[in-house]
Amino acid sequence: MAELSTRYNLPANVTENSINLDLNSTARWIKEPSVGGWTVKWGNFVFHIPNTGMTLLHHLKSNFVVPEWQQTRNLFSHLFKNPKSTIIEPFLALRILLGVALKDQELQQSLIPGFRSIVHMLSEWLLLEVTSAIHISPNLLGIYLTSDMFKILMAGVKNFFNKMFTLHVVNDHGKPSSIEIKLTGQQIIITRVNMGFLVEVRRIDIEPCCGETVLSESVVFGLVAEAVLREHSQMEKGQPLNLTQYMNSKIAI
């Protein structure tokens, strides 16, 4: 019987995403200096991070600010008026964002147990450490982090970026401007401001007297410029959006 055959079919087009797919890239954090900032490589992402906002954050944290900035200092008093707060560099703030993006997938999606374990390890590494690599057993990577799972993971990070771009800049219209997540021992708040995204991490302590959880005064925070994430986001492709998503002259950052 004559049978259908694909003997002489042309090779399928190879997309950019399938070239040099390195599953181990999720376990490496490569940071290199660049003109005016840094280049960070993680997963299949390459982020170009300018040293934007650092000087302004330090000015806001000082006592020598113009009157127009006082409202911003008052709104974020736990950051700018708190002697126990620490400003971190933009690439560390980005690292926290990526950790939260992975944690968001871990908490919200029905992942198979082995894959969930890898996502958990990666998110904890990004959130709690500053090392350039994490060792994950090659057997685990080979079994649970397949190329398809890798693509799902990266797509989930992009979806989280898209969610961030639905936020409005801090405003007085009651429109949502922050994403908050509570993890074991810490609370992370991501807030959209004029310059990008303000990332803050506050430790959660337990009161010895009553066992209740309270937010510690100790907090680290940093700023990720909007352009860093926009090139990896699928939002705002020409459609008009509410202007409160873009600018609020009442805040300094």
UniProtKB/Swiss-Prot annotation:
Coiled coil ranges: none
Listed GO CC annotations: host cell endomembrane system; host cell plasma membrane; membrane; viral nucleocapsid; virion membrane
Key words of the record: Host cell membrane, Host membrane, Membrane, Viral matrix protein, Virion
Intracellular or extracellular location(s): Virion membrane; Host cell membrane; Host endomembrane system
Subunit structure: Monomer or homotetramer (Potential). Interacts with nucleoprotein.
Function as written in the Swiss-Prot or TrEMBL entry: May act as a minor matrix protein that plays a role in assembly of viral nucleocapsid and virion budding. Unlike Ebola VP24, mVP24 has no measurable impact of host dendritic cell function.
The protein's name: Membrane-associated protein VP24
